[in-house]
């Protein structure tokens, strides 16, 4: 049944793409349906401004009474009242004088905030307090209208009896709130309602003795729109956000969520902004996970998240990015705004930095919570101290000097792994030269590193050299030039040729005595090094490994180049980059041949972008392994994007098993074969109201679905409803998650409902739909 339903949604998306209906800005359409204030807004105290009255007939009994009849038109500042009969009554004398105006036989009142019509009105001219009967009201410049049997209009609020409210445009009562009493606060932009009934198409669906509702853009505490759905993991679920506007610079959202398969999950988020910084603190907690297929020891599932950015004084900065979950399966089992299973790890960092024009330093703490099933995780850097110094224009402007220094202490949760202090200094001297033909940069650098190491505390821990010194000099020569010509094989275009030549030399140093030698469960090298991914731009990097513990030898030339095509408006429409490293000697880090380059050349690397038209974009990258005579890595993306949020994207990814094995240590590759994945994303604002999003990813090598999603959303000016169906891979059979040895999928269905028009912002919701999922939409083009 689920598959048939899903196919129906997919078919709807496919056929809707061929709709001839164009998309118009929904917000502009909605604003066109509400009254706008005509003329220039008059500033100042309206009560002190003169009153102008026009009428067909006037009877004056000065100073106590005046009667105006026939097409009565009264203006004062931004206020404008039209009625058939108006009476002005004055009583008292001097400071105690009281003036009242009575509109009879129907009236029409307008100002820059509200339009009001009714049968009769009484206006206290001293205070402008107004009482009306059988009134209809419409906000000016924003959505919101209704009626009231009687209304008291005051400077700061409107008190309505037997009243209604809706944000729908005139002649549309898709939803409406009826209340025995309603108080609308003008400056605070919210309404209180007592004995409120929520109606949909005239049918009562909800009653509450008290309700608060925003009627503007200001934040207000209260219930937000809930969401509900079902999932094979969670069962039926219901989520109810509760918003608390603590202060102008503090707010919080609490979201209880009930899942029939798992129980209650309590979620909360606190946001703050003060003189020293801004940030967000969030938590998710499920006390007892009742899901029958979850076999983890810890039934209490939780998440903590903290992001903070602060400016301390003029030159100090503090940054915190901390995410911690109860178990490795958390992001696979729960959809969260604070992480994803595709990330592979949760970051836990804090950094305090000081900046000056030519130097800066920072002290930080860094660790990662890895979700892979590994017995030895990454190292923690507790603490890490970095220092950078820059001095340009030395030797009469010929040389640039830079110094990077670092001290860091490494710890590991595994008692088998060693701990260490690492002290590193990296001075460099650059001789940059450039003219209209190109640039030449000669750089010399020295890597000076000292380690103080201790073996792991376990009796099975391997012995390790306690003190290690490493000194590696480096020289790099980088030459670039740009050649341009308007004589190309494509008429109307200017072509550039940009050759890029680099020579890099760094002598070999055996670094096998840095960190663990034998533990194959550790996924890195040393303490913080890992083999970097390769592409065209990586050909010109100094190092093959991240971190500082593995600095490979180098005696190599990098040959590369880029060609670009520009149209007559100087817009870049196409580029192609191609390059390769030529090794004069193997690049090594130790005596293990698996860690060295083999052959005299690296893979060919290619990158290309092509803007075929204003609507069509293509991007591709390709690597060819000359040693194995096979493709090692490839990906391509083609996108049709005729309008802002309308797009169709096709993509393909490939990585050979040899490439994966080269970049990951033993046991890290769970596929044990090539990776071949195809995918497509479709998003279309079919008309003024309909939004469709579809996504499909399939692993060809495994012949397994990765993710498929279809969502439909219908928007009007005052409400929207969205439904979505999703099926995605939760885990593979070698995960210790379930006794079921087959691949595990989660099938889910969700529905969202939203009241719109309560503020000025209108949007289709298509961006939010694209951001969800295992593989959210990415626009990879740079043309």
Swiss-Prot record:
* GO CC terms of this entry: cell outer membrane; transporter complex
Where does this protein come from, organism-wise? Answer: Mannheimia succiniciproducens (strain KCTC 0769BP / MBEL55E)
Main location (coarse class) = membrane
- This one is known as LPS-assembly protein LptD
Q: Does the keyword Oxidoreductase apply?
A: no
The family database entries (InterPro entries) matched by this protein are listed as: LipoPS_assembly_LptD, LptD, LptD_C, OstA-like_N
The region annotated as signal peptide is 1-24
Q: How does it assemble?
A: Component of the lipopolysaccharide transport and assembly complex. Interacts with LptE and LptA.
Q: Which GO terms describe its biological process?
A: Gram-negative-bacterium-type cell outer membrane assembly; lipopolysaccharide transport
- Top-rank lineage group of the source organism: Bacteria
Where is this protein found? Answer: Cell outer membrane
Task: State the protein's purpose.
Answer: Together with LptE, is involved in the assembly of lipopolysaccharide (LPS) at the surface of the outer membrane.
Its family remark reads: Belongs to the LptD family.
Pfam families reported in the protein's UniProt record: LptD, LptD_N
Key words, A-Z: Cell outer membrane, Membrane, Signal
Instruction: State whether keyword Membrane applies.
Output: yes
């Amino acid at each position: 049944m689920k598959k048939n339903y899903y196919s129906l949604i997919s078919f709807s998306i496919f056929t809707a793409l061929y709709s001839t209906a164009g998309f118009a800005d929904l917000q502009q359409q909605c604003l066109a349906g509400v009254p706008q204030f005509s003329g220039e807004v008059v500033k100042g105290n309206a009560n002190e401004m003169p009153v102008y009255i026009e009428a067909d007939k006037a009877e004056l009994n000065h100073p106590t009474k005046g009667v105006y009849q026939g097409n009565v038109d009264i203006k004062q500042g931004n206020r404008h009242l039209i009625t058939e009969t108006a009476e002005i009554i004055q009583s008292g004398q001097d400071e105690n004088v009281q003036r009242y105006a009575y509109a009879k036989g129907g009236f029409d009142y307008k100002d820059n905030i509200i339009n009001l019509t009714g049968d009769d009105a009484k206006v206290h001219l001293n205070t402008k307090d107004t009482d009306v009967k059988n009134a209809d009201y419409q906000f000016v410049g924003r959505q919101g209208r209704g009626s009231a049997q009687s209304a008291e209009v005051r400077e700061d609020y409107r008190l309505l009896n037997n009243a209604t409210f809706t944000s729908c445009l005139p002649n549309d009562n898709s939803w409406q709130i009826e209340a025995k009493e309603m108080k609308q606060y003008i400056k605070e932009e919210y309404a209180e309602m007592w004995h409120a009934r929520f109606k949909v198409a005239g049918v009562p669906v909800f009653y509450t003795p008290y309700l608060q509702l925003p009627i503007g853009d200001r934040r207000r505490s209260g219930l937000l729109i809930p969401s509900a759905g079902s999932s094979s993991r969670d069962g039926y679920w219901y989520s109810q956000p509760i918003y608390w506007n603590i202060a102008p610079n503090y707010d919080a959202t609490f979201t209880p969520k009930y899942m029939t398969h798992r129980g209650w999950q309590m979620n909360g988020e606190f946001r703050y902004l003060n003189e020293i910084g801004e940030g967000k603190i969030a938590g998710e907690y499920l006390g007892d996970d009742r899901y029958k297929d979850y076999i983890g020891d810890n039934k209490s599932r939780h998440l903590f998240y903290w992001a903070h950015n602060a400016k301390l004084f003029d030159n100090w900065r503090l940054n915190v990015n901390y995410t911690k979950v109860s178990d490795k399966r958390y992001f696979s089992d729960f959809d969260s705004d604070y992480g994803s299973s595709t990330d592979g790890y949760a970051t836990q960092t804090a950094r305090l930095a000081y900046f000056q024009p030519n130097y800066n330093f920072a002290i930080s703490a860094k660790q990662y919570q890895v979700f892979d099933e590994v017995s030895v995780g990454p190292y923690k850097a507790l603490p890490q101290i970095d220092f950078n110094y820059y001095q340009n224009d030395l030797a009469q402007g010929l040389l640039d000097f830079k110094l990077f220094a670092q001290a860091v202490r490494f710890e590991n949760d595994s008692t088998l792994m060693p701990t260490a202090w690492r002290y590193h200094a990296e001075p460099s001297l650059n001789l940059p030269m450039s003219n209209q033909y190109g640039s030449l940069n000669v750089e010399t650098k020295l890597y000076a590193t000292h380690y103080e190491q201790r073996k792991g505390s376990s009796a099975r821990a391997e012995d390790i050299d306690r003190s290690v010194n490493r000194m590696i000099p480096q020289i790099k020569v980088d030459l670039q030039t740009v050649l341009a010509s308007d004589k190309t094989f494509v008429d109307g275009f200017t072509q550039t040729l940009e050759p890029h030549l680099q020579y890099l030399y760094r002598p070999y140093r055996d670094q096998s005595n840095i960190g663990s030698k034998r533990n194959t469960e550790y996924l890195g090298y040393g303490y913080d090094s890992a083999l970097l991914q390769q592409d065209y731009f990586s050909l010109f990097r100094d190092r093959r490994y991240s971190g500082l513990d593995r600095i490979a030898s180098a005696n190599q030339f990098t040959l590369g180049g880029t060609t670009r095509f520009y149209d007559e408006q100087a817009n870049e429409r196409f580029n192609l980059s191609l390059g390769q490293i030529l090794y004069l000697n193997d690049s090594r880090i130790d005596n293990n041949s698996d860690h060295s380059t083999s052959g005299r050349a690296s893979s060919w690397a290619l990158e290309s972008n092509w803007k075929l038209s204003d609507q069509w974009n293509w991007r591709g990258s390709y690597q060819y392994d000359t040693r194995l005579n096979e493709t090692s890595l490839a990906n391509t993306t083609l996108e049709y994007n005729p309008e802002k949020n309308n797009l169709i994207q096709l993509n393909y990814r490939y990585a050979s098993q040899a490439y994966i094995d080269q970049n990951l240590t033993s046991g890290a590759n769970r596929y044990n074969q090539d990776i071949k994945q195809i995918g497509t994303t479709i998003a279309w604002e079919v008309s003024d109201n309909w939004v469709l999003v579809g996504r499909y990813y399939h692993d060809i090598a495994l012949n397994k679905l990765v993710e498929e999603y279809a969502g439909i959303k219908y928007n009007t000016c005052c409400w929207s409803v969205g439904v979505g169906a999703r099926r995605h891979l939760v885990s593979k059979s070698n995960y210790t998650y379930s006794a079921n040895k087959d691949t595990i999928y989660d099938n889910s269905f969700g529905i969202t409902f939203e009241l719109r028009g309560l503020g000025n912002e209108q949007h289709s919701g298509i961006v939010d739909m694209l951001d969800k999922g295992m593989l959210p939409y990415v626009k990879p083009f740079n043309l």
